[in-house]
Amino acid sequence: MAKWVYSFGDGKAEGTSDMRNLLGGKGAGLAEMASLGLPVPPGFTIPTEVCTYYYANGNAYPAELKEQVAAALGEVGRVTGKAFGDTQNPLLVSVRSGARASMPGMMDTVLNLGLNDATVEALANKSGDRRFAFDSYRRFITMYSDVVLGVDHHHFEEILDEHKDRSGYTLDTDLTAADWEKLVGLYKQKVQDETGKPFPQDPNDQLWGAIGAVFSSWMNQRAITYRRLHAIPESWGTAVNVQAMVFGNMGDTSATGVAFTRNPSTGEKKLYGEFLINAQGEDVVAGIRTPQEISEAARKEAGSKKPSMEAALPDAYAELTRIYGVLEKHYRDMQDLEFTVEQNRLWMLQTRSGKRTAKAALRIAVELANEGLITREEAVTRVDPAALDQLLHPTIDPKAERKVLATGLPASPGAATGEIVFSADEAEAMKAQGRKVILVRAETSPEDIHGMHAAEGILTTRGGMTSHAAVVARGMGKPCVSGAGALRIDYAAGTLTVAGQVFKAGDFLTVDGSTGQVLLGKVNMIEPELSGEFGTLMSWADGVRRLDVRTNADTPADARVAIKFGAEGIGLCRTEHMFFDDERIQAVREMILADDEAARRAALAKLLPMQRQDFAELFEIMDGRPVTIRLLDPPLHEFLPHGDKEIEDVAAAMGADPKKLADRARGLHEFNPMLGFRGCRLAVVYPEIAEMQARAIFEAAADVAKRTGKAVVPEIMVPLIATRAELDLVKARIDAMAQAVKTETGGALTYLVGTMIELPRAALMAGEIAGTAEFFSFGTNDLTQTTFGISRDDAASFLGAYTERNILKVDPFVSLDREGVGELIRIGVERGRKTRDKLKVGICGEHGGDPASIAFCEEAGLDYVSCSPFRVPIARLAAAQAALGKGSASTA
């Protein structure tokens, strides 16, 4: 008989931490903690295979599942001494999701399941605390109705708020047993009104309703969005964990909390977290109440007057500190823990590798290696390359004036400025218009995830460091300030009030997620300083990677940034980007308007010294590192004005005839410029353009070599080659110019001539082309366009639908399509190296900074990747991980 249920508890478990794919992260963690003898409430896991079966069979379950669940539930009752549905000593359970990848808050949870009108009386009698029993029952009705019955929780919040207002109460803890009992009746009536049916009283019906709801939540919109943002496959499914309830809401000797074994924002090695006395777990993570600090040191640092867990519950605190040491040593990583204290007894509800900022990830990885818990190679694999992006963006200038409006909790580091928006939909809409926004909410919920993704930063008035906003923002690398209680939001009026000032949607704010400050208006930012653990981990990564990492740089500023980030050369210098300066664009336009070759050469002569200076600066900055310069690539019409007014203005500035300029612009118009008169085709028809650029390169190389005494070996790249004959023709012009400059300067010139492989024909004919080309650089942007027959500039209108419908697993312009484009690259490398065995091969499209694409480049045997300057550290780390066999496989 197939096994559909895995039990844990009482010092043993049927699963292990290695069974994460089957049991999900939560189930595997609970099983492992139980096996380690840690205090875990007994329970069982329904594995991800059941979720897969559920969706493949019209929301039906395997035939044996109900019998196995009943048996496992009976075993939980045996261990606890309780019975499910019993009216004397009832067993209550929680039902939680648990995917193999952490998806905080994205799926559904139900607590206190098993309560009904009879068992609530039994719970009251057994506990001797009627208030606790009815508080638990009203929580269950709220969660079950929201998750299973589709009755939104705001209905119950309104009933509660009205009752508190009428009774003169401020806090939930002010309510008495009689209050909760009355509210339970009102809640049940609301369910009857909304659904037309009474609230379910049969515990087994409740259980299967909750199990079905958790499986269904795998396909809710917020979970789908989260999976898309974090590249989590839909096919993985979720497990369901059913576990005996332990209660943190049994008075002042009970509590619930979340802790990390190291600080998830900074990586500092000390217990970090929050707890709430007389509460249940959802109160902490939902951010509805602002929690208390766990340690005395943290309480003093925060300036809180509320007691810490260390002071209020010293025995439970001591046990927690012991357990966190056990778990970190066992898992050899920072752990995120959930716990409940029931009448001074600590229970562990979850352990998992904790989400952390890039800054924390670097520090934790390096310190774990230095402590001997992991190797340096393991440390290199512990940091997500894409997360380094968090470290490479502006922070607030220390010299900037800070007009502090309020201070909350520093929930996710970094700083951001933007216009205030009060809803996730507004944030997404304004982002689409190119505007930067700060999402301001009382608290965020999983429904806000699309707006959080669109926002530059997040600001909440409630919630702590482990609230939904904090956890999700850290995972996204977004600055976040939470729990800024001095702020007052009026959603209906669209205003934010603080210290007597009223701000409207569209006003500018700055949030500093490193200090918790909310600042007035726009504030100056500075670039980050990278050192310490960053430098250490990067040096370890450089020690294991095989691929070189170059940069795409067109200006001295780009080149300097790239060198600072560890670039080993320039893999793509786009010479056309040097032509758009006001002085230069006029000379380019004169060249385009010229009636004959002589006039064109006269215009190009004006550009020669400018290009020579550009190249000389790059050669000097790169200090002997390779520099690959692409000859002019875009079609000429891109340099001409558009529209009558612009044409008249440009003609006046040039002293040219507006009609001639307009006629020339019309004459250069193309129906499909991506496949038109561009690239090497310009050099074939107008060889004088390539000659001018080659002369500028060689004169600059000779000048820098003479002044510095260091060899300069430029790599000249001819774009959009489809045939060897094209390359032969252009290379002959380049070689002739090299000989001329060599004769004029009397010095030696060493250079390489290669080509971009960006057309399928070029990849297929790579063996022949390599007879002339001394290196290949795969231009994966255009190769993707020409392989798919998709214009990158026009793809946004439909590519989203393709990824949503799983026609393409990822956007092929973001992550390389291995099966199609990747196969052409493999063919090109193999055939090229058959002709020229030491052929140097790289890529220089946007994919050069994508970790999954870099993993492919490692597998395909390329020599280097080239990416934008700010992605160089990402590429260095991704290349190291690829060499260690941990690259991200991604397919389209």
Please provide the spans of the model-predicted regions.
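Short beta->alpha connector loops at strand-helix junctions that form conserved
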Residues: 44, 461-463, 482-485, 573, ...
